[in-house]
């Protein structure tokens, strides 16, 4: 999923375009779904609001109700569920890091899953310690969060009929 280019967009129009583009992202765009596996996604952003005492507190807001600007961190939460009548094996969830956002190192979560990343558009995956990229200077270096293009979670145990789980990650607006 590619978010439209933001060059030339300023103020509310630019922020609204980013929000609108993020909301158009279907749940787990590249999820490798098995028969009976349903995947949904939600995106939230942390905003500062005043509480009843007038103090500023951080609150998670659904992306539909919030504006985002460069530097804001968006949390993507994907829920997977086995709607089939049998246990599901080899359940894999793949989600792209949207263009104009950069993955926040160490933010991917998923209890009972193996988490791998791609730096080549989802063609290959590996753990962070094994991924490299070629820098602008032509030298190979270890990949970092902003280099990741996709995240893959592999559920390690069979997912029981009616069972579900969640995975998540954060990405900052560039």
Q: Model segments located where?
A:
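Bacterial N-terminal signal peptides that target proteins for export
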Residues: 2-18
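Bacterial N-terminal signal peptides
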Residues: 15-27
């Amino acid at each position: 999923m590619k978010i439209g280019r933001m060059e030339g967009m300023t103020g509310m129009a630019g922020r609204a375009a980013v929000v609108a583009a993020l909301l158009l992202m279907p749940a787990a765009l590249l999820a490798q779904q098995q028969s009976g596996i349903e995947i949904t996604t939600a995106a939230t952003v942390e905003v500062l609001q005043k509480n009843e005492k007038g103090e500023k507190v951080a609150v998670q807001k659904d992306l539909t109700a919030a504006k985002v600007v460069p530097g804001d961190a968006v949390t993507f939460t994907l829920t997977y569920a086995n709607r089939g009548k049998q246990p599901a094996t080899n359940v894999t969830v793949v989600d792209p890091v949207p263009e104009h956002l950069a993955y926040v190192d160490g933010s991917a979560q998923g209890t009972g899953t193996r988490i791998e990343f791609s730096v080549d558009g989802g063609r290959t995956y590996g753990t962070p310690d094994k991924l490299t990229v070629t820098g602008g200077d032509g030298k190979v270096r270890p990949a970092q969060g902003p280099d990741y293009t996709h995240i893959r979670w592999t559920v390690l145990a069979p997912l029981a009929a009616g069972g579900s789980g969640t995975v998540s990650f954060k990405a900052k607006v560039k």
